[in-house]
Curated annotation (Swiss-Prot):
Keyword flag Magnesium: yes
NCBIfam families: ilvC (TIGR00465), PRK05479.1 (NF004017)
This protein's UniProt keywords: Amino-acid biosynthesis, Branched-chain amino acid biosynthesis, Magnesium, Metal-binding, NADP, Oxidoreductase
Organism for this UniProt entry: Mycobacterium bovis (strain ATCC BAA-935 / AF2122/97)
Residues annotated to bind Mg(2+) 1: D188, E192
Record's protein name: Ketol-acid reductoisomerase (NADP(+))
Catalytic residue positions: H105
Cofactor(s) listed in the protein's UniProt record: Mg(2+)
SUPFAM superfamilies in UniProt: 6-phosphogluconate dehydrogenase C-terminal domain-like (SSF48179), NAD(P)-binding Rossmann-fold domains (SSF51735)
């Protein structure tokens, strides 16, 4: 683990950093780098809706190609599915020997969608939290833990540069963990697909469907399997599984111990292993790239099917009653 005393802020202060993208992480990195005394410019395509926001926040903005030409550290924070095209068209032609190419996620490099030239350093600085939290913690004098990894290090200074960058966005205040592009990428994809997004979503929908099919009101089913999920996850987030079980009733704890293994059993675990193998051997990324190249047709169809699920219909109606819930733009428009 690395902390403030392990990182030299002056290293990144002596470089010119171009941040490609201004989404959740892009805005947090750019503003915190600037506030740490680093020269920074944001790379966005002409006509990007984020350009006025960047300018309002006092940052310089130019095209990705011009920013890559100006910078000697390029942090790529554009969406995963756009990175390879941006790299090939805008970044790679403007890289110079001795430059550094940074990423917030290792997917494109690990699976060979981006192949950097041998004379540039390739590293990753990945905060383990959303951009708004990274920025808020930085402003409050705190930080969000980060992962760092060095994939390519022609001059031998890649780790020091990555740690300096992490310090500039507040990461070393909380702690920085050294990893590899391989481990970060594969564990991130596995967690998303089997637990955080895919697994949780299907578990919620299945529970909702079982209750509704048994004759219970959809509103009650929604509250029991989706709305209250946040209460349980928050307890786990704060103190692990033990904190969750300490905080719920004995009835809930006893029932959870008995029934949980019947829902998530050895067969589930074996299928999770299958998914991990598909991530490791590149099968998943192959499907992802094929869908992107085909115009995201499969993704759009899956989105449509998900949006039409009955839990989404009843959920929108119930959230209209919850004044304390922040509503997404799609529900308030």
């Amino acid at each position: 683990m690395f902390y403030d005393d392990d990182a030299d802020l002056s290293i990144i202060q002596g470089r010119k950093v171009g941040v490609i993208g201004y989404g959740s992480q892009g805005h947090a990195h750019s503003l915190s780098l600037r506030d740490s005394g680093v020269q920074v410019r944001v790379g966005l395509k002409q006509g990007s809706r984020s350009r006025p926001k960047v300018e309002e926040q006092g940052l310089d903005v130019d095209t990705p190609a011009e920013v890559a030409k100006w910078a000697d550290v390029v942090m790529v924070l554009a969406p995963d599915t756009a990175q390879a095209e941006i790299f090939a068209g805008d970044i790679e032609p403007n890289l110079k020997p001795g430059d550094a190419l940074f990423f917030g996620h290792g997917l494109n490099v690990h699976f060979g969608l981006i192949k950097p030239p041998a004379d540039v350093a390739v590293a990753m600085v990945a905060p383990k939290g959303p951009g708004h939290l990274v920025r808020r913690q930085f402003v409050d004098g705190k930080g969000v833990p980060c992962l760092v990894a060095v994939e390519q290090d022609p001059r031998g200074d890649g780790l020091a540069l990555a740690l300096s960058y992490a310090k500039a966005i507040g990461g070393t205040r909380a702690g920085v963990i050294k990893t590899t592009f391989k481990d970060e990428t594969e564990t991130d994809l596995f967690g998303e697909q089997t637990v955080l997004c895919g697994g949780t979503e299907e578990l919620v929908k299945a529970g909702f469907e079982v209750m509704v099919e048994a004759g219970y009101p959809a509103e009650l089913a929604y509250f029991e399997v989706l709305h209250e999920l946040k209460l349980i996850v928050d307890l786990m987030y704060e103190g692990g599984l033990a904190r969750m079980y300490y905080s719920v009733s004995d009835t809930a704890e006893f029932g959870g111990y008995l029934s949980g293994p019947r829902v998530i059993d050895a067969g589930t675990k074996e299928r999770m292993r299958d998914i991990l193998r598909e991530i490791q051997d590149g099968s998943f990324v192959h499907k992802l790239v094929a869908d992107v190249e085909g115009g995201n047709k499969q993704l759009e169809e899956l989105r449509r099917q998900n949006a039409e699920h009955p839990i989404e219909v009843v959920g929108k109606k119930l959230r209209d009653l919850m004044s304390w819930v922040d509503r997404p733009i799609t529900e308030t428009a």
